[in-house]
């Protein structure tokens, strides 16, 4: 079986990244078409926000892989893989997260009490390291539903990322209390 060389893999990955950035995934494309027919459908806007957020995460994953391949190409004798932290910002992924925020804001405009939108706004903000804003979204989600274990869990993640282990622990415990059967799968 023939394997692709690293330069070819990098080129293919860059092309996939370009396609994702320019066109989104199949869900984004479908929802964009459907929203032209039903521009006031809050549920579709919510789904579009989720799809844009997912595209941003996919783009970041590809950016990590691209950086790893570039490192290995430039350091063929390296004994270990590079650290999985990007050395530069990825504005394309941030654009996708901002598109998610715009969709979630449209949901709030159409239906201010739409369940789950504050938590998902927090996820998109957290993906951009805008932790203070994410924190406010999760707190608002918990005000709206004190049993929203996803909001409690993500608030714990936000506090952990902010370096506040005490509050992180408290909200992880709350999430576990709210959903003791959870296996760590948050949606």
Task: Show where each model-derived region lies.
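Canonical positions in the second alpha-helix
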Residues: 34, 106-107, 140-141, 174-175
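Structural marker of alpha-solenoid helical repeat scaffolds
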Residues: 37, 110, 144, 177-178
């Amino acid at each position: 079986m023939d394997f692709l060389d690293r330069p070819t893999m990098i080129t293919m990955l860059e092309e996939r990244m370009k396609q994702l950035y320019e066109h989104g995934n199949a869900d984004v494309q479908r929802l964009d078409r459907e929203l032209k027919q039903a521009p006031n459908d809050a549920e579709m806007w919510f789904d579009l926000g989720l799809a844009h957020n997912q595209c941003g995460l996919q783009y970041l994953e590809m950016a990590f892989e691209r950086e790893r391949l570039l490192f290995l190409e430039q350091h063929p004798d390296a004994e270990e893989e590079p650290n999985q932290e990007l050395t530069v910002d990825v504005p394309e992924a941030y654009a996708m997260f901002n598109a998610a925020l715009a969709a979630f804001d449209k949901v709030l405009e159409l239906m201010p009490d739409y369940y789950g939108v504050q938590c998902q706004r927090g996820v998109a903000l957290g993906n951009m390291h805008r932790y203070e804003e994410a924190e406010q979204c999760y707190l608002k989600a918990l005000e709206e539903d004190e049993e929203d274990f996803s909001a409690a869990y993500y608030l714990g993640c936000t506090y952990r990322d902010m370096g506040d282990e005490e509050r992180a622990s408290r909200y992880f415990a709350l999430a576990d209390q709210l959903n003791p059967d959870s296996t760590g799968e948050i949606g």
